[in-house]
Every structure is written in C-alpha cells, then in structure tokens.
C-alpha cells in the first residue's frame, strides 16, 4: 500500500469553495516533495497495470494527533506557546488545510489494506478545513496563552488550499471518519 498526499493534486485558489479533488483529478504537484509522491503513485500503479501486483494508494490530508513530528504546525505552535515564544506563520496565514486525526487515517488505511479491491486509489479526508492562522489561534485559546503572531516569508511554491472528496472510500468500502475535530484536537 502506498500512502500518498493531497499535495499531488496541486493547489486550489482560496476563494474556490466548490472544488474538491477526487481520485480522478489531474496530478499537478507544485513542489519537489509533491512531485516525488506523484511519481511514486504513478510507479506503483504501473506495477499494478504491468504485473498485476496487488497495490492500493491512499492520498490523505494533513494529519494531527499525539506524537506528531515536532516541526509540524500543531506541535510547533504548542511548543512555542509553552516557551513563551512568538508564533511564526508563513505569508498571511490564510492557507487552508484539511485536518485528519491520525487514528482516523490509520483506520482508513487498515480498511483499504484488508479489502479485496486492488489497483484503486482512495482519498482520505475529514473535511476539517481550517486556515493555518486559525489553527494557531485555536491552540492559543485552548492553552489559554497569548503570543504574538509574526508573519514570515512564504516558502517557495507554497500551496494555498487542498480539499479532497473522500466519498469513494465511504461508498466503495463502507468506511467513514469517526473522530470529531473539536474532541480530538484536545488530545494533540
């Protein structure tokens, strides 16, 4: 099973509240990281088509939860707040991300792996779309701590928004996300 990313589809304009990438959307990676993931997806599918290797691919949105890598947005924000440091945000902070609780992600991958269906791609999303700056404010509020938010230069090729249509995993495999963002956010 290949675990991929929503970044392989490229970015959606912030003001587009309609578009959701489905599994048939064109791959338009905009960074070396996302291009490497898109390339891996294509390589995996080529082995399925050529050799009938039983493969599946999942493309997920941003994960959050306990034990997340410390350089990621949520744990980094928590750590900076605990140390009384300024919060650093790229650009205007309005970039939108869909947040998927890690337990939901693991359960979805488990469902895919244990299904009899091969050669398929599944998007995994919880439809918890929140701007980066609002995530920082939510964490600050939850921790009852205030720090200055300092805007820094955006990273090159920084995508503005990813939104996935994950209905296929629901109707094909009967899997639905179970975790509520507000409840699980506190566990992070």
Region spans (language model):
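A conserved pocket-lining segment of Rossmann-fold NAD(P)-dependent short-chain dehydrogenase/reductase
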Residues: 23-28, 53-66, 77-100, 123-125
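Conserved Rossmann-fold NAD(P)-dependent oxidoreductase catalytic core, especially the SDR/UDP-sugar
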Residues: 1-30
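Aromatic/hydrophobic pocket-lining residues that form π-stacking "cages" and hydrophobic walls in ligand
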Residues: 44, 77, 136
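Short-chain dehydrogenase/reductase
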Residues: 19, 25, 29-38, 68-72, ...
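C-terminal substrate-binding subdomain of Rossmann-fold SDR/epimerase-dehydratase oxidoreductases
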Residues: 81-188
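Active-site Tyr-X1-5-Lys
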Residues: 11-14, 28-56, 81-83
